[in-house]
Amino acid sequence: MYLSRFLSIHALWVTVSSVMQPYPLVWGHYDLCKTQIYTEEGKVWDYMACQPESTDMTKYLKVKLDPPDITCGDPPETFCAMGNPYMCNNECDASTPELAHPPELMFDFEGRHPSTFWQSATWKEYPKPLQVNITLSWSKTIELTDNIVITFESGRPDQMILEKSLDYGRTWQPYQYYATDCLDAFHMDPKSVKDLSQHTVLEIICTEEYSTGYTTNSKIIHFEIKDRFAFFAGPRLRNMASLYGQLDTTKKLRDFFTVTDLRIRLLRPAVGEIFVDELHLARYFYAISDIKVRGRCKCNLHATVCVYDNSKLTCECEHNTTGPDCGKCKKNYQGRPWSPGSYLPIPKGTANTCIPSISSIGNCECFGHSNRCSYIDLLNTVICVSCKHNTRGQHCELCRLGYFRNASAQLDDENVCIECYCNPLGSIHDRCNGSGFCECKTGTTGPKCDECLPGNSWHYGCQPNVCDNELLHCQNGGTCHNNVRCLCPAAYTGILCEKLRCEEAGSCGSDSGQGAPPHGSPALLLLTTLLGTASPLVF
């Protein structure tokens, strides 16, 4: 019973989690513009596509209202609650902070009680239209990564248009129309994002989904970014490679999610009835408590950092690019036409770095050790060619094998690299470390591997001692010659002269011993001698 209850609770938790987290938290790993790799030429840079993290872009915008004096409170006025036209004791006064509703309250911290919001003047000049343009400007190209969400403190407007600009507000194009009656307001058939497809995802639609009359729980308007992404990446955005492929190859799709400015055009406030109640015009106004815009600086996949300085956003460009959006090659790096980075292949993409111009390579940043460079397309990098003065590496900044860095010389000094001079007999190879120490064979020591460790002697390299005057003594009168062999008397042989020569010939007991000493151990010989010289015993 307990097991089945646990499984039921677990299944419920999985279901709730999937509902609460419909999209992946991480969309792609493009957080590095370059990394170092090792090649035969030493360490070189490997470049990859990169982009800044998605963030709350409302922190960096400037807001402008048109007409400029449309905000309530100057002069002070009272307004009615829309749900109850007889509750007209709410006051807006721009000179009193507690009663003021300036535009910046659309972007402040949410969750306060009571809530903060911007509010327009009431529709006291009816039948003249009450219309407001709210322009959000970044002075920078940004890419939208999440839904645009507008939360109204009052009822949602009966008519509204969300517009975008790609040229800093010089021209505008509609993003989406909102109305209680699309056909009447904009001569368009009502649609929702669910009616679109991959082929019609760029269609500008009018929706009635968010423009119903005032209700307590119906204050939010969306512009659905993620639902449009889902046409390519799937309903849970798992197939990001498909979306990235479309963004790479379809400029119109990429531009659709790119803006420099947004404009909210409020054309008709929430009326709540068919006709406007001219006796209670103080109940008609616009009030917005929050606007959410999430995205990232557009850096054309050439930067991971976007700096906000002096009220301006700027990409910190990599890949030898420059410009506010990294949209051109740096001076002297026009070796091929500028190109944006590419998301593909997943997961690192393609950097499409700018390369040096042939006429501007100069000394190729080779510290004076070469005047030639070569571009390696596979690595998207430029390396020095034919490094002189025993140097090597991408910028001739390393020493060739068999040489080490002269710590007292600058990188551009001809004597920056010193030969290792490893002893060929004592070292494993001719290379040394950064301090000039060679790698020695067993029994060998010294910076150049030309000295022997104790117990070893030099003989075409260090060899273990065969004999010495300390532990490995030559026996039977033998003498040690240069620690490499014992010089034995004529009757003895062996490494330490420890064997009788006749033992090897097998003739120690024959008459032809030629004066060989009697066969036997030293103890037996001593006993025989003692017995031969002793006096006879008397009984």
UniProtKB/Swiss-Prot annotation:
Cell compartment(s), UniProt: Cell membrane
Q: Which residues form the propeptide?
A: 511-539
Q: Where is this region: NGL discriminant loop II?
A: 208-214
Please indicate if the UniProt record lists Transcription as a keyword.
no
What post-translational modification information does the record give?
Answer: N-glycosylated.
Please give the residue ranges the record annotates as the region NGL discriminant loop III: 273-275
Q: Which UniProt keywords apply?
A: Cell membrane, Developmental protein, Differentiation, Disulfide bond, Glycoprotein, GPI-anchor, Laminin EGF-like domain, Lipoprotein, Membrane, Neurogenesis, Repeat, Signal
Primary localization: membrane
Listed GO MF terms: cell adhesion molecule binding; cell-cell adhesion mediator activity
Glycosylated positions are N133, N320, N406, N433
Q: What is known of its domains?
A: The laminin N-terminal domain mediates 1:1 binding to NGL ligand with sub-micromolar affinity. Three NGL-binding loops mediate discrimination for LRRC4C/NGL1 among other NGLs by binding specifically to its LRR repeats. This specificity drives the sorting of a mixed population of molecules into discrete cell surface subdomains.
What the protein does?
Answer: Involved in controlling patterning and neuronal circuit formation at the laminar, cellular, subcellular and synaptic levels. Promotes neurite outgrowth of both axons and dendrites.
Instruction: From the Swiss-Prot or TrEMBL record, give the protein name.
Output: Netrin-G1
What organism is listed for this UniProt entry?
Homo sapiens (Human)
* Gene this chain is encoded by: NTNG1
